[in-house]
Amino acid sequence: YRGDVPGEYPLETRPTVRRHVRVDFADSWQAVEQRLADSVSSGQCACWIRNTVPDAREAYSQLKDQHPEWKIDLFHARFALADRFAIEQRVLERFGSTSNHEQRAGQILIATQVVEQSLDLDFDQLITDLAPIDLIIQRAGRLHRHRRDVQGNRIEEKDQRLEPTLTIHSPTWSDDPTAEWFKTPFPRVQTVYEDHGQLWLTMKLLRDHGGFRMPEDARDLIEGVYGTENEIPDGLWRASAEAQGENKAKASIAFLNQLNLDSGYTTLDAANWWDEAKTPTRLGEESTTVWLARWVNGELKPFHDLPPFAWQQSSVAMRTALIAETGPNSEIPEEIINTCREQLPAKGKWGVFLPLLKSQSSVWQGNAKDKNGNPDTLYYDAEQGLMTSKEYNLQEGQNQ
């Protein structure tokens, strides 16, 4: 900046963060499992980033069942805050910047996108489900993040591990994919990343180049997927067109709802703001804060009774489509439920109160209703997090 004339001055990237990442692909469960087995046998640590919570749970349960000797942990966003903090501490101890060989060796983490955010984690091996290119680049930042020797101990000199390799769990490659190319192998994710053409372009770019250099390749990678001149295969064109139309509609909504800074705080903007209105700051699936309570010995208490913020420690975020209101409960007196609800932040107005009873399987369960008013039983434990009945039954089926 010179006086009142702005200018741009490029800064050199630090040598410690400039690197080449090799990319390979695994188009089956068995291929991913083999890479994890190789990591364990060589005394390395690994992470598999999955695109949905159910997919992460499924991988965690199957791997634990098939390899009981492995040291595996599960990390996603659907844990009560106290449990999530405990998991974060374990994850940082095993994979954080100060972790050593003894803490890292043979450890495996199955996670969702939560590992991309704020935590300083460093894995020897990294596997990710196929995602848009910008997320792939971001996730790769957790691979060989710090300089280490061949055993995984921190060092100051050049990293002594093999070249960082990012494995992408993906559909089988096709030059001419059908509309089912991504939907069939990843049925839970098809509505998370709706533009399947962009996913195909991401895979094509990385296949063609065999990897990428950062930061040199960043612009070419982004433009190679999001550029307007890129050609989408006919089989994926419709899904891409619909996704892009939806994104344009969301952009229009955002434009109409932006604040007019020149008018100050008035009610003349596109959307009137009331004293207690819900004012979301982003578009997307709405989420709800769920306040967990446990019924023990005739008392209803926060699930994690840890003053002074017991209710906050007992809260978990979940999609409103899955849980929108408290369901009927015949075992806990209504007056006790109402009295407990009064203790919640804002008396529970902006969330769902979920009293839980311990089931015969030692998992906590409670009744709720989804966004359409359909009743459901929800389940919670500190290992798997909060589950709908469908998710829980699927989990139990895998464990049998």
Regions found by a protein language model. Name each.
Residues 47-49, 108-110, 127:
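Structural motif
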Residues 1-2, 21-25, 84-87, 101-104, ...:
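Short linear motifs at secondary-structure transitions and domain/linker junctions
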Residues 120:
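Flexible glycine/serine/alanine-rich "lid" or loop that lines and gates the nucleotide-sugar donor pocket
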Residues 16-21, 68-70, 105, 162:
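A short helix-to-beta-strand connector/capping loop
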Residues 34-46, 54-89, 93, 98-99, ...:
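C-terminal helicase lobe and adjacent C-terminal extensions/tails of nucleic-acid helicase motors
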Residues 1-53:
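Conserved interdomain linker/interface between the two RecA-like ATPase lobes of SF2 helicase motors
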Residues 101-116:
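Conserved two-lobed SF2 helicase motor
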